[in-house]
């Protein structure tokens, strides 16, 4: 931002560059980005999060043909970030601005993007819609980068089944064909296992994180695998660390991803 302009002058600079933009006003963008209380201040007088939002406001008002945003909300308080994400997505859609967003926050990418690209070591490893990137990662590298599950050893036992030493039989639809007897690495995501205290398959709870709408349990198997499992926070049977956690059998996964 220009240091000799106050915040509203900096934002208005974007509007002046595109006077034909009638869909979004300076007042509207200041309000939705919660900048009303700092609009008369200068850049050196505001926080990094406020400066980041002011820069975003100016960019939106200029209505470019292509907008590149590098970690646009990295300094925004978490309590306010989700609200901005909703409004930002709405504005980008309404103004039909083609936007490339660079972020390390996969959830932010999944929400804001119609397409997601995973870039590792300067190479584009996967480019697809967010659902497919999450549920059908195309390599171990992408799985490790997203960090939304664990790869466990298994043996293919049939067209729709495989076997794991700790979990037993797992059934589902293979995304890729593997001959019977193949040794594979199965992607197990936190939502793939269901809690059932009546089950004879019990795993030890080694960690529990409360995330508002759900708990994320980390369970240890006999072979010392650490498996994450989601459980809704309203679930009546909550478990503490060192307790046993039942896993429903048979284990059924909609789509089986292996490597």
Question: Language model features by range: what are they?
Answer:
Residues 134-157, 187:
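C-terminal boundary and immediately downstream tail of ABC-type ATPase nucleotide-binding domains
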Residues 149, 160-259:
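Non-catalytic connector elements of ABC transporters
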Residues 42, 101, 129, 153, ...:
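Short, solvent-exposed coil/turn linker segments
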Residues 3-141:
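ABC ATPase nucleotide-binding domains
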Residues 1, 145-146, 217:
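Long, contiguous hydrophobic alpha-helical segments, chiefly transmembrane helices and signal peptides
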Residues 13, 47-48, 146, 153, ...:
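Short glycine-rich loop/turn motifs that provide flexible caps or phosphate-binding loops at active sites
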């Amino acid at each position: 931002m220009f240091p000799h302009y106050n915040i509203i002058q900096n934002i208005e600079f974007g509007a002046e560059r595109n006077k034909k933009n009638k869909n979004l006003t300076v007042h509207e963008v200041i309000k939705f980005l919660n900048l009303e209380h700092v609009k008369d201040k200068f850049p050196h007088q505001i926080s990094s999060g406020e400066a980041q939002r002011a820069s975003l406001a100016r960019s939106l008002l200029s209505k470019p043909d292509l907008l590149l945003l590098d970690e646009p909300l990295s300094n925004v308080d978490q309590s306010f970030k989700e609200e901005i994400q909703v409004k930002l997505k709405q504005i980008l859609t309404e103004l039909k601005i083609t936007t490339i967003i660079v972020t390390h926050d996969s959830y932010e990418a999944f929400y804001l993007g119609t397409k997601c690209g995973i870039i590792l070591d300067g190479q584009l490893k996967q480019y697809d819609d967010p659902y497919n990137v999450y549920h059908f990662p195309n390599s171990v590298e992408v799985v490790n980068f997203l960090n939304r599950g664990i790869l466990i050893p298994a043996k293919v036992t049939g067209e729709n089944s495989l076997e794991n030493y700790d979990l037993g039989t797992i059934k589902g639809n293979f995304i890729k064909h593997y001959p019977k007897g193949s040794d594979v690495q199965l992607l197990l995501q936190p939502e793939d296992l269901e809690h059932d205290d009546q089950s004879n398959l019990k795993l030890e709870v080694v960690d529990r994180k409360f995330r508002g709408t759900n708990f994320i349990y980390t369970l240890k198997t006999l072979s010392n695998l650490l498996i994450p499992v989601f459980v809704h926070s309203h679930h009546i049977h909550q478990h503490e660390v060192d307790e046993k956690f039942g896993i429903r059998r048979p284990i059924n996964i909609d789509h089986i991803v292996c490597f």
